[in-house]
């Protein structure tokens, strides 16, 4: 139930008062009011005015909000999300999106039976696509991944999975797993915060969106070593990734490798073979995997994997250069918007550190809540 609106109309402009700064954005028959008090430690609040019924609604807010600052500027993007630029914050930390009518928000609203909005941090540049590697037990995918990590330690990283099981001896929370309560992981799964999950021996295991995003934030490509069912779940999510299936030259060769381990009983081997046959059958599902790698010879397979990942290509995105040059340390606010771009104006003295006074923000977006919104392109306006 909403509360009756007071007898005043909120316009689609920034409203400043002694106590707060508000941005009111009209989208159809609703006005989204984004408010904060002038206390820099306060968080942003969201209220929605239904203009047809003149009632206020306080939505369920998903995702972590921007860090508290004194003020912000805002503008509507694609009629489905609101771009927020935090004032007084370096550019690379100041860009946020409040999703109000995206597919993710619509899905969550349907699940929860209430009005939902969601925060997503904006990131300049695309970032490297994560890599999903699947394959039956014994095919050698673990060895291939280990070789990648050894040769390119600064380029690749693993996401840390979540589990509800108790830590084993010498296991460290946040290093081996994120150990969590069942109620919490189930709640986050329902909120779409997990790319994939499975119930194993009474416990829940899963890969969260944040675990993958945090690796990308470090400038590395995240590797997900998951089974075919997990790969199917990731493919169905909003995450843009490269999907690779590693297969044996023949089923007989796979059985030979499993038996050569000498670490499992006949019953365990037969179970692994049954699972392997099912995974090999599923690997041919249309649209599931981008590449199939046959691991007949380990070194040859590894070289083919590196070619797939274009590891010899040292191309640098112009946005990466912009960030590395330190130009993102200046503070900006929204000046104007056109159909294809948003102009940002520097709040820093133009003579300081060679700061560019005007920047063009091209909104070629990818991703979004519950993860980051990537693909923002920045260029100076001469």
UniProtKB/Swiss-Prot annotation:
Q: Which cysteines are joined by disulfide bonds?
A: none
Q: Does the keyword Repressor apply?
A: no
Domain of life (superkingdom): Eukaryota
Q: Which GO terms describe its molecular function?
A: ATP binding; guanylate kinase activity
Q: Does the keyword Cytoplasm apply?
A: yes
- SMART domains, alphabetized: GuKc
Matching entries from Gene3D superfamilies are given as:
Guanylate Kinase phosphate binding domain (3.30.63.10), P-loop containing nucleotide triphosphate hydrolases (3.40.50.300)
Q: Which residues form the active site?
A: 168, 261, 272
Quaternary structure and interacting proteins, as annotated: Monomer.
Misc note: Plants silencing GK1 have no visible phenotype.
Family, per entry: Belongs to the guanylate kinase family.
Which protein, by its recorded name, is this? Guanylate kinase 1
Q: Which organism is it from?
A: Oryza sativa subsp. japonica
Q: What is the lineage of its organism?
A: Eukaryota, Viridiplantae, Streptophyta, Embryophyta, Tracheophyta
């Amino acid at each position: 139930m909403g509360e009756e609106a007071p007898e005043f109309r909120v316009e689609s402009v920034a409203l400043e008062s002694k106590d707060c700064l508000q941005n009111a954005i009209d989208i159809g028959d609703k006005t989204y009011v984004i408010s904060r008090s002038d206390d820099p430690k306060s968080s942003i609040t969201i209220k929605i005015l239904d203009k047809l019924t003149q009632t206020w609604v306080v939505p369920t807010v998903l995702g972590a909000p921007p860090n508290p600052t004194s003020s912000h500027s805002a503008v509507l993007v694609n009629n489905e999300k609101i771009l927020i630029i935090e004032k007084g914050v370096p550019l690379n930390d100041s860009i946020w999106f409040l999703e109000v009518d995206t597919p993710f928000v619509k899905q969550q609203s349907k699940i929860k039976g209430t009005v939902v909005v969601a925060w997503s941090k904006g990131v300049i540049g695309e970032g490297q696509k994560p890599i999903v590697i699947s394959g039956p037990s014994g095919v050698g995918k673990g060895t291939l991944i280990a070789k990648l990590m050894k040769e390119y330690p600064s380029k690749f990283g693993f996401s840390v999975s979540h589990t509800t099981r108790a830590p084993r001896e010498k296991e460290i929370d946040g290093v081996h797993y994120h150990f969590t309560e069942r109620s919490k992981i189930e709640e986050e799964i329902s909120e779409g915060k997990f790319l994939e999950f499975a119930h194993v021996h009474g416990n829940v295991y899963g890969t969260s969106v944040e675990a993958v995003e945090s690796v990308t934030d470090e400038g590395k490509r995240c590797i997900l070593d998951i089974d075919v069912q997990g790969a199917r779940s990731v493919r169905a999510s909003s995450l843009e990734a490269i999907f690779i299936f590693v297969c044996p030259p023949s089923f007989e060769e796979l059985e030979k490798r499993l038996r050569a381990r000498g670490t499992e009983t006949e019953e365990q081997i037969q179970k692994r073979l049954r699972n392997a046959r099912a995974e090999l059958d599923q690997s041919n599902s249309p649209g599931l995997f981008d590449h199939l790698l046959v691991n007949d010879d380990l070194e040859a397979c590894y070289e083919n994997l590196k070619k797939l990942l274009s590891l010899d290509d040292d191309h640098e995105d112009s946005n990466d250069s912009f960030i590395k040059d330190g130009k993102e340390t200046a503070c900006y606010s929204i000046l104007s918007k056109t159909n294809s771009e948003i102009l940002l104006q520097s709040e820093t003295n133009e003579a300081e550190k060679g700061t560019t006074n005007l920047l063009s923000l091209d909104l070629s977006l990818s991703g979004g809540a519950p993860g980051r919104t990537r693909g923002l392109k920045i260029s100076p306006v001469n």
